[in-house]
From Swiss-Prot:
PROSITE patterns: PHOSPHOTRIESTERASE_2 (PS51347). Catalyzes the hydrolysis of D-xylono-1,4-lactone-5-phosphate and L-arabino-1,4-lactone-5-phosphate. Also able to hydrolyze carboxy 1,4-lactones. This is Phospho-furanose lactonase. It is an enzyme of class 3 (hydrolase). GO terms for biological process: catabolic process. The lineage of its organism: Bacteria, Bacillati, Mycoplasmatota, Mycoplasmoidales, Metamycoplasmataceae.
Length: 353
């Protein structure tokens, strides 16, 4: 990796080789938004609890946390900057721009629905290159923070890609092309992941800068293998400590399978601890004993070793892959004429053209 490769944190760009053990998809502060309609546990605004959680992560050897809260879906630039400043020189915080799944946006009046794609791309590029809007593009005022986004989020729903989600995927791909910023996509219960990868690449995104999340909720190792081999993207397994979906042993076995197939360069890990009772220190504020970010080190990494995943592969998954994937690419010029014919036809079918 070239020495000038960098990862964009909220406190500035850092050398990619310095980011250390990285949690590639997590949450520390979630300041309201549509997720709260699903469960009140999605409201996470306790800065002190979040700081304690980061400290435990650091104490276990963690160095970088990528927080995947896009504008209007929990993102809080003020509080996240406070946390980042508290750990300056000890831990890196990366924040996101972009969108979540279409269910979180009004299909008629949201700016994702109303604003032309070209203009939304400009808005996202500004968040990466100039600074995130402290008001989350709620309008009519835009106030740029000193903190810039270091990753682009998109999202898709269960077993279908909504027309607004395809629009958000195009925005993500074009923003990534223009800025070099990496992409991570929420795939609901791990569905439509292959199609998501194909569409992003069809728009021109670099597959090495794409991560797909929540595939662990669709426990099919052959599906994972197919996605990686056919598209070259990376799967971010974000679900240790989710026994309601599957035991940790199943996820560990799936990772071992992929490693044995020579695909360890296409795996990253995280906790996706985006609810109060998914973090130890938030749980304590509710009078509950729960697990937290330290679970990765105390329980899941030992399990990976137990099932036979080598230390070399673990180092790739936790350190080497994130620093390559999260490092900004060389910016390119978006060329609409090079978009795949399949994506162009899908845009026509979904009346996006």
């Amino acid at each position: 990796m070239a020495k000038d490769k960098f990862v964009r944190t909220v406190l500035g760009d850092v050398p990619a080789e310095s980011i250390g053990i990285t949690d590639c998809h997590d949450h520390l502060i979630k300041n309201g938004g549509p997720e709260m309609h699903e469960h009140p546990d999605f409201l996470m605004i306790d800065v002190e609890a979040a700081k304690k959680e980061v400290q435990e992560y650091v104490d276990h050897g963690g160095k970088t946390i990528v927080t995947m809260d896009p504008p209007n879906v929990g993102r809080d630039v003020y509080r996240m900057l406070e946390i980042a400043e508290a750990f300056k020189g000890k831990a890196n915080i990366v924040m996101s721009t972009g969108f979540h799944k279409a269910a979180f946006y009004d299909k008629y009046s949201s700016w994702l629905a109303c604003v032309p794609t070209d203009d939304i791309v400009k808005m996202m590029v500004a968040e990466v290159e100039e600074g995130m809007d402290e008001y989350n593009y709620n309008g009519p005022v835009v106030k740029r923070s000193k903190a810039k986004a270091g990753i682009i989020k998109a999202g898709t729903g269960y077993a279908a890609i909504d027309r607004l989600e395809l629009k958000a995927l195009e925005v993500a791909a074009r923003t990534s092309i223009t800025t070099g910023c990496p992409i991570l996509v929420h795939t609901q219960l791990g569905t439509m992941a292959l199609e998501v990868a194909q569409h992003l690449i069809g728009f021109g995104a670099n597959p090495r800068k794409i991560q797909l999340s929540h595939l662990n909720k669709n426990p099919d190792r052959y599906y994972y293998e197919k996605i990686i081999k056919e598209t070259g993207v990376t799967i971010c397994f974000d679900g240790p400590d989710r026994v309601k979906y599957y035991p940790d042993s199943l996820l560990a076995d799936h990772i071992k399978y992929l490693v044995d197939k020579g695909l360890q360069k296409h795996i990253t890990l995280s906790l996706d601890a985006g609810r109060i009772l998914y973090q130890r220190n938030y749980g304590l504020t509710k009078g509950k004993e729960t697990f937290g970010l330290s679970y990765l080190f105390e329980r899941f990494i030992p399990l990976l070793k137990q099932v036979g995943v080598s230390q070399e592969a673990i180092d790739d998954i936790l350190i080497n892959n994130p620093r390559e994937i999260l490092a900004f690419d060389e910016p390119r010029v978006y060329d609409a004429s090079k978009v795949s014919s399949e994506v162009v036809q899908l845009k026509k079918d979904l009346k996006l053209l």
